[in-house]
Amino acid sequence: IAEENYSVLKPTAVIFNLGVNDPGNMYDYISYYQEIAESLQKKNCKLFFMSVNPVNSKTIEYLGKNAIRKEVIRKFNSVVGSALGSTFEYIDTYSYLMENGYGTNISGTGVDMPDDDGLHYTTKTYKRIFKYCLDYLILH
């Protein structure tokens, strides 16, 4: 019965986004997304995969932590984006942020903090990512 209630005319956009914590499991993510895609498409969902976004490696390393390299993020985005390409549309926020800049701070809660962890974005950057995705959805 629930299947009958989904709109035939206007699909629901579903955007998947992963963080930078787990690049070693990219093939597990691909399998999982491929596994759930058919079920979501039956519910008239249009599927999108948003890129893993850049980090400020210099800040992370300055804090004495291991930073994921931009090359690893680009490879992850390329492999996952290509594997899902026939079912998911790819929203390349990574390139957008690299071209237009981004800010990081320690918060990640929507309230900016004076400290920076190089990983979480400023409120302004999160809003820019959100707007970029909305603009992408309007065009696609």
What residue ranges belong to the model's regions?
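Active-site segments of SGNH/GDSL-like serine hydrolases
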Residues: 15-21, 37-74
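Charged helix-capping and loop-helix junction motifs
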Residues: 28-35, 73
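Catalytic His-Asp segment of secreted/periplasmic serine-dependent ester chemistry enzymes
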Residues: 55-140
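An active-site-proximal structural segment forming one wall of the substrate-binding cleft
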Residues: 5-6, 39, 79-83
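Oxyanion-hole/transition-state-stabilizing segment in secreted/luminal serine hydrolases
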Residues: 1-31, 53-57
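Extracellular/periplasmic catalytic domains that process cell-envelope and extracellular macromolecules
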Residues: 7-10, 42, 128
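A generic local structural motif
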Residues: 1-3, 34-35, 77-78
